[in-house]
UniProtKB/Swiss-Prot annotation:
Protein's UniProt keywords contain NAD: yes
The protein's name: Acetaldehyde dehydrogenase
GO terms (BP aspect): catabolic process
Protein's organism: Cupriavidus pinatubonensis (strain JMP 134 / LMG 1197)
UniProt-annotated catalytic positions: C133 (acyl-thioester intermediate)
HAMAP family registered for this protein in UniProt: Ac_ald_DH_ac
Length: 313
């Protein structure tokens, strides 16, 4: 007997939406594609979806609601923009109040979800926010330190290939920094978080690189390092191209020579530096676009776990 699957629609037929569609078609265990929704009739994503036998519309969320199979759609991934997501969520809830929304924009109208850190707490949420690519890569590392020692401050720098940043990413730079900074605090456990994104124009394009600086209370270095390595291995379960680029680095900040952190004041304790790289699985996007791959992989892992819980309830 075939396993029952939940039907998913994707709004946004750009880089992220198309990669996500291919992941669901190839690897969906509890999910299957129901519809691909865009606003550009000439988009490659819609053409690809049609070729793969997926229902499509270029009329946005209204087009989705008008599709004959809309009644069967259980989960909607939104890969548009922060502003569009707010409208999409409101409109879909007018028609189907209980629909599940997985938000891949920085809108964050629902609670943040970083699968390896807090997915089990989000299984009943009707709208979850996948933070940002930088957040999905770095917040697990902040949380790894946080479970060993109190984290006073965490700063992340996400460097992504300029070529992998489509119009949606570029339009949402401010939202990226705000949402990631907030999630570093809410999910990562830092008292204060800061996020910086760098679009690297290098050719040939470089894979995603992330640097995480964590200032915490004094702690056992071996315990912190073990926690970080364990967390990295957990992320690799759904993002195989995620890895520590080099050994974790530690610096003691003595009370006699404290750091001055804006908004926090003087700090002494342990500084932990983590260097990451994320290579994409190259399902649709090139391997250098690890920043987009980690978003689609995290979104799929989240929706699969939610679908599994719903189907076995």
């Amino acid at each position: 007997m075939a396993t029952r699957k939940l039907k998913a629609a994707i709004i946004g037929s750009g880089n992220i939406g198309t990669d996500l569609m291919i992941k669901i078609l190839r690897h969906g265990k509890h999910l299957e594609m129901g519809a691909m929704v865009g606003i550009d009739p000439a988009s490659d994503g819609l053409a690809r979806a049609a070729r793969m036998g997926v229902a499509t519309t270029h009329e946005g969320v209204e087009g989705l609601i008008s599709l004959p199979n809309f009644a069967d759609i259980d989960v909607v991934f939104d890969a548009t923009s922060a502003g569009a997501h707010v409208k999409n969520d409101a409109r879909l809830r007018e028609v189907k109040p209980g629909i599940r929304m997985i938000d891949l924009t920085p809108a964050a109208i629902g609670p943040y979800c970083v699968p390896v850190v807090n997915l089990d707490d989000r299984l009943d949420a009707l709208n979850v926010n996948m933070v940002t690519c930088g957040g999905q890569a770095t917040i697990p590392m902040v949380a790894a330190v946080s479970r060993v020692a109190k984290v006073h401050y965490a700063e992340i720098v996400a460097s992504i290939s300029s070529k992998s940043a489509g119009p949606g990413t570029r339009a949402n730079i401010d939202e990226f920094t705000e949402t990631t900074s907030k999630a570093i605090e809410v999910i990562g456990g830092a008292a204060k978080g800061k996020a910086i994104i760098v679009l690297n124009p290098a050719e040939p394009p470089l894979i995603m690189r992330d640097t995480v600086y964590v200032l915490s209370a004094a702690a056992n270095r071996a315990e912190v390092e073990a926690s970080i390595e364990e967390m990295a291995a957990a992320v690799q379960q759904y993002v195989p191209g995620y890895r520590l680029k080099q050994k974790v680095q530690f610096d003691e900040i003595p009370a006699s020579a404290p750091l001055n952190i804006p908004g926090l004041g003087k700090f002494s304790g342990l500084k932990t530096s983590v260097f990451l790289e994320v290579e994409g699985a190259a399902h649709y996007l090139p391997a250098y676009a690890g920043n987009l791959d980690i978003m689609t992989s995290a979104a799929l892992a989240t929706a699969e776990r939610m679908a599994q819980a719903a189907l076995t309830a």
